[in-house]
């Protein structure tokens, strides 16, 4: 049986989840793995840099329009063969995005045959600063078997990461690791490494802040496609390899607010 990795990446809004998820997906696909990325954000932008800036229809939008959805309507092949899917979100002010994800993924499973089972790695790019009832549903439904938290070394992203760890632990979902997407703050790698250690997990990667990431995104590309020789591309390759090989899964502890403030001073 295929040793399939199905991961969710959580973190504070705006911390760089979609950028990290899409570049890791591309890096793993370049290494010969079958990869799918499933965007779960109402903005439906998780796969945009794998598709050269193209936005694709979301499952929930098509369902609302009454379309008889087929696999080719919602699964698109992006850079390096990454399969790209956008679940979409509810209409503004109506419904729960988390529960919408469940509807979308169940629909995807029903129309895609063995496509999901054939993947070596499936990445769920999950929105939100907290693990609410809706957003943990993919975990409870068994869609996901590993969780990663993305943060920087600043107080608010760490506060969100800490809350996410608390929420995951409450539902019995192990944490596989922490990823630091740098904002160039003082002692950042040290802070996030210490945070990871104190919650019982591990720092998977420190991704330095580089202008090339924004430059590539502005043009509609992933770093892996547009700047493959950059130091950031190499970091994404190492992170992808580390995720594929990672076997560590812990029920994460969470820190007190006082300890978080102490860490980030």
UniProtKB/Swiss-Prot annotation:
Pfam families: Fer4_NifH. It is an enzyme of class 6 (ligase). Keywords: ATP-binding, Iron, Iron-sulfur, Ligase, Metal-binding, Methanogenesis, Nucleotide-binding. Gene3D superfamilies: P-loop containing nucleotide triphosphate hydrolases (3.40.50.300). The keyword Cell membrane does not apply. It catalyses: Ni-sirohydrochlorin a,c-diamide + 3 AH2 + ATP + H2O = 15,17(3)-seco-F430-17(3)-acid + 3 A + ADP + phosphate. InterPro entries: NifH/chlL_CS (IPR030655), NifH/frxC (IPR000392), P-loop_NTPase (IPR027417). PROSITE patterns: NIFH_FRXC_1, NIFH_FRXC_3. The keyword Iron applies. Its EC number is 6.3.3.7. NCBIfam families: F430_CfbC. This is Ni-sirohydrochlorin a,c-diamide reductive cyclase complex, component CfbC. It comes from Methanosarcina barkeri (strain Fusaro / DSM 804).
